[in-house]
Amino acid sequence: MEKAIEVKGLRKSFNDAEVLKGVDFEVKRGEIFALLGSNGAGKTTIVRILTTLLKQDGGTAFVNGFDVSSKPEHVRQSISLTGQFAAVDEILTGRENLIMIAKLRYLNNPRQVADSLLKSFGLTDAADRRASTYSGGMRRRLDIALSLVGNPPIIFLDEPTTGLDPEARIEVWKIVKELTNNGTTIFLTTQYLEEAEQLADQIAILNVGRIIAGGTLEELKKLFPPAKAEYVEKQPTLEEIFLAIVGKKGRK
């Protein structure tokens, strides 16, 4: 399958602090790729480099076939980014937010684009309310809808459920799963182990600036034998895998 993202030897330092220490991974088209790591592991730094908001110090990164260093404008045309905090204009209504982005992308029929996305995200009834009146889950749904204006092939979701209650988080998970049905590639960063377990086709664990393990959930589970309790095999959870891998690397 064709690669949507390819990263080799990515390095980045801030002053004397080396944040990325030679990161390698690839993301196939149409899959959900979860970059899992604790706070300060370097997840957001990777997202900022891949979305052309930050220059790497070394290594290469290609997004949708374009080098982020030499073809940043082509990369930006191929992607959308939703950060940890909603980038919604709270003074505008939900519909007005979407129309504004559609106009900025020079799309035909901005209102039609807005109405279609409002329907897809279950926001039609709230379309003419100011975004400031939306719940956290509704605001996040609108934020993700904004990222879909223009149908970018690759979407970066940087900790998209930070600050949401469990019910709103499940709402967002459902939306993310549905996005890949249309062939969209999702690059997801999260510190929620359950989020990666629920959503990801591929998981990479980032720790202190390095990818220390990667693969499908089943492949990661094979790194650790199942525990036996009362003659029943208990498969390791992603949380147990994460803590075991990070703990091993931390002791080295």
Residue ranges with predicted function:
Residues 59-70, 74-75:
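Conserved ABC transporter NBD signature motif
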Residues 155-159:
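Catalytic Walker B motif of ABC-type/P-loop ATPase nucleotide-binding domains
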Residues 80, 99, 103-126:
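Conserved ABC ATPase "signature" region
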Residues 214-215:
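ABC ATPase "signature
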